């Protein structure tokens, strides 16, 4: 006799699906960001390792991923973020999160980052994680 077992999809797939659904249903949320030069964040400060460790930790705790790395974030083109764009390095990368505490931690750990927040999706920022790259 065959046995049927229900399998649970990996947490990363579930998180991606949930985030996709939120984005497609115009779920308005506040996004916080830490912005730095690509050279600093991707080369001088190996921050990708920190993000990998954080993703692993979230997976073990079955927590929904609430942070993303966005190279050349499109949200900086929104009129309300003109001041941040003027201060941003030409080649930049953002750590974006719906968790303000995480961005505060990033700021404390890295120091040389610009932080801020925005609401999305909106007319000016239809996709909070869109990249110009």
Swiss-Prot record:
Mind telling me which InterPro entries this protein's record contains? Ycf54, Ycf54-like_sf
Q: Report the superkingdom from the record.
A: Bacteria
Q: Which Pfam families match?
A: Ycf54
Q: Which family does it belong to?
A: Belongs to the ycf54 family.
Q: By what name is this protein known?
A: Ycf54-like protein
The species is Synechocystis sp. (strain ATCC 27184 / PCC 6803 / Kazusa)
């Amino acid at each position: 006799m065959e046995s049927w077992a229900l399998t649970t999809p990996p947490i990363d797939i579930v998180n991606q699906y949930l985030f996709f659904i939120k984005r497609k249903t115009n779920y308005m949320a506040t996004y916080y960001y830490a912005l730095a030069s690509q050279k600093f964040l991707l080369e001088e400060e190996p921050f990708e390792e920190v993000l990998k460790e954080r993703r692993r930790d979230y997976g073990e705790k079955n927590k929904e991923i609430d942070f993303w790395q966005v190279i050349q974030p499109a949200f900086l083109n929104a009129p309300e973020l003109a001041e941040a764009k003027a201060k941003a390095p030409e080649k930049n990368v953002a750590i974006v999160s719906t968790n303000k505490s995480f961005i505060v931690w990033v700021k404390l750990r890295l120091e040389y980052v610009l932080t801020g927040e925005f609401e999305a999706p909106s007319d000016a920022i239809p996709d909070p994680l869109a990249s110009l790259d």
